Amino acid sequence: MPVKIGIDIGSSTTKIVAFEGEHMLPPMAVKADSQVASLYGAFGRYLYENNLQLLDVEGVYITGVGSKYVEKAVYDRPTYKVDEFVATGTGGYYLTDKKEVIVISMGTGSFFVKVTENEMKHLGGVGLGGGTICGLSSIILNTGDIHEIVPLSRKGDVAKIDLRIGDLAKEKLPGLNLDVTASNFGKADAQSKPEDIAAGIVHMVIENICQAGILASRI
């Protein structure tokens, strides 16, 4: 059965997925120093692990910041470039049964796309994402490896790092519960444990991306 392959060539990671007819095959992510090397490495590995032949591929659809470096057909298969905002919005919309959604792309940085039945609109973005987590962790925790940062963060307690409304008031304020963040890292000090700091970094980035997404939904 003909296969269509989608590849997102990001700044640090290349993501790949395929559809065999209406059936979606398992996605894969590959890291590499070179975006072009990452593309071809991911493509070949994906075919191998899914028992696909090159001639099975009827189309390769590429997007992401690294797609600009691809100037010819991938392995001589029909290759098409797709706008990243369109790809993200369409993919997010596909995964939900809602008629109107805000799709948040959390990558190295993050951006927001509004999608309805009749419209797709890029709403903007923020400079927070995986790059922030890895960068701050490299400076503070001496590791930028996300596979080390995430397990460490799960052992931590963000309540020991963030200042919350409950730390400032005995009763909840109008529209603000006591567990709402008043200040990310507002309680951190030189004695804070690495696992708590890791939890604070991850929480700060994800919380603020989601808050920005909520604000974007009101535009």
What are these regions (language model features)?
Residues 174-219:
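Adenine-nucleotide phosphate-binding core of ATP-dependent small-molecule kinases
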Residues 28-32, 43, 48-84, 117-122:
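Short beta-strand-loop/turn "lid" adjacent to the catalytic site in phosphate-handling enzymes
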Residues 2-8, 57-61, 100-105, 125:
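Short glycine-aspartate micro-motif
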Residues 70-104, 109-119:
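Conserved phosphate-binding catalytic cores of ATP/NTP-utilizing and phosphoryl-transfer enzymes
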Residues 8-13, 65, 104-109, 127-130:
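A short acidic Gly-Thr/Ser loop motif
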Residues 3-41, 45, 120:
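Short glycine-rich, Thr/Ser-proximal phosphate-binding strand/loop in the N-terminal lobe
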Residues 93, 118-173:
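Glycine-rich phosphate-binding loop plus the immediately following alpha-helix
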